Regions:
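Transmembrane helical elements of multi-pass membrane transporters/channels
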Residues: 6-22, 187-199, 203, 218-288, ...
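Membrane-proximal transmembrane or re-entrant/amphipathic helices at the cytosolic face
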Residues: 426-427, 449-503
């Protein structure tokens, strides 16, 4: 099994672990630190997350150009691009610290109206610690890019598995004595520093990388800057979508509203990870395809093929959440989080369009055409911000979700599909024809599943798990029998045979 397949499998293992740990972890956090402290932790985390984008797209650019030189067996180019990127990361780290200090001195003015004196004091302490965490991460991000470019996904994803298991265990251990949001931040920072040291050791001891400045290439710098800034703009707008709504709610509604929105956020971020688990390991492969000048038909075929598999999985989760989501949130988070269901629905449905097409983003990066995505995403983010503020004031979290869902539908859906077809040459009509055919089976599953849920008695945890299992089997049978192509069925059968042999 090659590293790419291992990377995909480990990504899904990590998603499952993240979901399981998260769904167990959040009630434990709420139990130890309470709703307000949890909301405070999410609020400061949302604010500090903006500093993580200050790599200015360097990570994606390093992966792309390092992979290109690696494919061409240009050792000097590989060493040179790492040296240049380290200067960039150093500047990004310094800038993030400068901006962070300015924000720190203005925290009282931003949140003074919605926080108590005690909450503000703890918020300042958490902000400084998490700012340090971000600075350490930014200055060493190049090592993650190198491991990704070498497609060493067993190590890269394995570290993520370790983090998923150790972090909640460490947090719970600390909360026994110090039940505060600050204690959670301390545990996260300590573990993050340890993992960074492990990645650095792997790069030098196992990959034997060398970082050395050889020459200045103006054309390379122009291409590098174009991709890096494009990725930076997209990452910035990602923060608008996924973090700004919580900050708006923190200002106009307080920490309790942030906690409700954060429950929905945890669900739709796990939903997003189901898609990016596949596309995230394909950038080096697609970069090699583009470098080898493979025809656009090959890229279009890959775009449709991966999109179908992503849709099979995402449609299962989306329809399952529509049917069972209210009961799930009640069993998981308890009372007071009813709006989280509608917030999640309003976001994941339009978001699905973008998620089943995110191989297209890797294609744009490999072609260095990502600047259009950045421009459209910028306009989409502005639209989201303009809509989210008044809707958040009037309707709370649901209003913010409406703004985000509508903005994604317009920008990530309609406009990006036009660009893929018109300027990249991907066969978008064929893509949507195939997705439409699958949707017939998905709709049938939704109707049958909803009817069975209404008819079958039981609302406890055991009954809930049985319904989830039953719906998953129903979905699998219908989609396999009606929607899947023969070659897709053969892949499923091949996986089943491997499981039987291993069993």
């Amino acid at each position: 099994m090659n590293e790419r397949k291992i990377g995909i499998l480990l990504s899904y293992l990590n998603i499952a672990l993240h979901a399981i740990v998260g769904f167990l972890y959040v009630p434990i956090l709420l139990h130890y630190i309470g709703k307000s402290e949890y909301g405070l932790y999410q609020l400061i985390g949302s604010l500090i997350a903006y500093f993580s984008i200050m790599d200015f797209g360097l990570t994606a650019a390093v992966t792309r150009f390092y992979t290109k030189y690696k494919a061409l067996k240009d050792k000097v180019g590989m060493e040179n691009i790492l040296a240049i990127s380290l200067y960039g990361y150093g500047g990004a780290t310094a800038l993030s610290l400068l901006v962070g200090i300015v924000c720190y001195w203005n925290l009282d003015g931003i949140f003074g109206a919605s926080m108590t004196v005690g909450e503000l004091l703890e918020a300042r302490q958490m902000f400084l610690l998490l700012l340090f965490n971000i600075a350490v991460s930014l200055s060493t991000m190049v090592f993650r890019s190198v491991i990704n470019a070498h497609e060493k996904f067993l190590f890269l994803k394995g570290l993520e598995t370790v983090q998923l298991i150790l972090q909640p265990a460490l947090v719970i251990l600390i909360l026994q004595k110090y039940p505060t949001a600050m204690a959670v931040a301390v545990a996260q920072t300590a573990l993050n520093v340890g993992l960074i040291l492990a990645r650095m050791y792997y790069c030098f001891a196992w990959l034997h990388i060398s970082i050395r400045f050889h020459y200045w290439n103006q054309e390379l710098f122009h291409d590098f800057k174009k991709l890096a800034l494009s990725v930076f703009v997209v990452t910035l707008i990602d923060q608008v979508f996924w973090k700004t709504n919580q900050i708006i709610l923190g200002i106009v509604r307080g920490t309790a509203a942030v906690a409700v929105y954060s429950i929905a956020s945890l669900i739709y971020m796990n939903y997003m990870a189901l898609s990016t688990a596949i596309s995230g390991v394909y950038l080096p492969h697609i970069t090699e395809m583009v470098a080898q000048r493979r025809p656009i038909e090959d890229l279009s075929s890959l775009f449709i093929q991966i999109g179908r598999w992503q849709y099979y999985l995402l449609a299962l989760v989306a329809t399952g959440f529509i049917i069972f989501g209210k009961q799930f949130i009640h069993l998981w988070a308890g009372n007071g989080f009813e709006d989280s269901y509608w917030i999640t629905i309003l976001i994941i449905l339009p978001f699905t369009i973008d998620l089943i097409q995110n191989i297209g983003l890797a294609i744009l990066q490999a072609m260095n055409r990502y600047d259009f995505r950045a421009k459209i995403y910028l306009l989409t983010g502005v639209l989201n911000l303009v809509l989210a503020i008044p809707l958040g004031i009037k309707f709370g979290g649901i209003g913010c979700a409406v703004a985000t869902g509508f903005s994604m539908l317009m920008g990530n859906g309609i406009v990006m599909n036009y660009f893929y077809k018109k300027y990249i040459g991907l066969d978008i009509p064929a893509f949507w024809k195939q997705i439409g055919q699958i949707t017939i089976s998905v709709g049938l599953c939704l109707l049958i599943g909803y009817g069975l849920d209404r008819m079958l008695p039981g609302s406890g945890k055991i009954a809930f798990l049985c319904k989830i299992f039953g719906y998953t089997v129903l979905y699998g049978v219908i989609v396999y029998g009606i929607a899947m192509k023969s070659e897709e069925k053969e892949k499923v059968q091949g996986i089943a045979r491997k499981f039987r042999r291993n069993g």
